[in-house]
């Protein structure tokens, strides 16, 4: 991720604002250690991306997303016809990643 950002910035030396980065987390699915589809994993991925972005002087902003989970066509990549990438559930209840973001953004 960090290397790809640097490569793109070398080719296009402009300020960067990165939006819509996340991974899926099924609401209420928790696992320690974290595992794919868990809220812990989503929070770690988003926090890790933000740490990388904060270390790049050419990155002037970021906004993980989407805000909330949303319906999609059913497939093996979309359990129960949902995209679970949101920081909040479809009903707008915060997932662990939303709480993690609040902590990061208050620093």
Task: Please give the residue ranges for each predicted region.
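Substrate-binding clefts and catalytic carboxylate motifs of secreted carbohydrate-active enzymes
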Residues: 1-107
